[in-house]
Each structure stands twice: as C-alpha cells, then as structure tokens.
C-alpha cells in the first residue's frame, strides 16, 4: 500500500466495496469492471478508480478487477481477519435492537457484552449477550479487552461514560446520542444522529432542485 493518507470519504466506501465483492465471490464470479461495480454500489466509476488508486495497482486495464484478490485485499485492509470485541452501553429500545442485529455483513465484529442501569435487564442474557451493571463497565472493558463501544444512553450521561470508556482503554466509540462528545486524541468518536439524518432527508425531498452535488 502506498504510504499516504486515505481520505475519510474513501475510507467510508471501503466496506461498501468489500461487501459487494464478497457477494460476487459467493456467487462464483471471477472478475468485475469498475463500471459494473459502480452500478452495484451507486458510486461513479471515476470515484471508484480514484479510491482504488490510493492502494496501488489493484486491477489491469482492459481486464478489470480479480474478485477474489480484491476481496481479500479489502478484507485485510478492513481487518476482517481479526476479531474486534464491541461493548454496547445502554440496552433501551435502540440498544435492544442493536443487540438483535447480528452484524452479518462482517465476520470480524462481535458484541460481547452490554451494560445498563435497569435492574430488570442487568444479569440477563439478551440474544446471547450478557448484560452487566454500569458499575462493572470499566472492569469488564479491561478484562474482555474491548476496543470499541456503542453508545445508546441518554445524552446527559454520555460524556461521563465516555470519560470512563477512554480510561478503561476503549479506542473507538460509535455515538448514537445527540451529545457532541470530547475524548482524548487516541479515542475516535463517530457520531450517528438519526434525527439529523432524517431531517436532512426531508430537506432533500423538499429542496431537490436547489441542491448542487459536491464530490467528497
């Protein structure tokens, strides 16, 4: 791989490419063109070629891309050969739904534990995942070597929990709360604001003719 910084927009598209390549591989297909890949993942072929160029020569002009080789390359790039243990913080409505989600699009992600304050849930096994009390969170994070946490708790409690997660050694947080959180530089936070996404979608529906496409 070339020694250079990969744009965030490119990094966000890599799982999309990988999942489609895996699907092609499962159906026995041997090669794919950038045009075919573009139509399937709805990313223009020029962007795909530019994304791939950050990783060196991945295909051959006039031939396309070898599905298995490209799939294996992105699997390694996305650390699909390493199991990442994930903790879920908050087993409310959204948290419960995420516990039921099997992360079927990746064999390398496993929610191994969950934490909550609700005494009716704590101590139970929900969809095969043990739910611990919040006071056990830091200890279990360390014992189970958790690197990533999903946050689905009330926004007012989020920063306090993030501070503890960072202290316990968590390196990445997927934040479903409305709070904008502060963490040490070595901890990455990715925000998923469902209300914001829905409001943005509604805006697009009503202002479609006014929008100008911007390339990420």
UniProtKB/Swiss-Prot annotation:
MF terms per GO, please? DNA binding; DNA-binding transcription factor activity
Cellular component (GO) terms are: cytoplasm
Which keywords has UniProt assigned to this entry? Cytoplasm, DNA-binding, NAD, Repressor, Transcription, Transcription regulation
Q: Which residues bind NAD(+)?
A: 90-95
Among SMART domains, the record links this protein to:
CoA_binding (SM00881)
Q: A biological process (GO) annotation for this entry? A: response to redox state
Q: Where in the cell is it found?
A: Cytoplasm
Classification via InterPro entries: CoA-bd (IPR003781), NAD(P)-bd_dom_sf (IPR036291), Rex_DNA-bd_C_dom (IPR009718), Tscrpt_rep_Rex (IPR022876), WH-like_DNA-bd_sf (IPR036388), WH_DNA-bd_sf (IPR036390)
Keyword Transcription (UniProt): yes
Could you tell me which cysteines form disulfide bridges? none
Q: Which Pfam families match?
A: CoA_binding, Put_DNA-bind_N
Which residue numbers delimit the DNA-binding region?
16-55
Functional summary from the UniProt entry: Modulates transcription in response to changes in cellular NADH/NAD(+) redox state.
* Family in the record: Belongs to the transcriptional regulatory Rex family.
The record's subunit annotation is: Homodimer.
Protein name as catalogued? Redox-sensing transcriptional repressor Rex 1
The record lists the lineage as: Bacteria, Bacillati, Bacillota, Bacilli, Lactobacillales
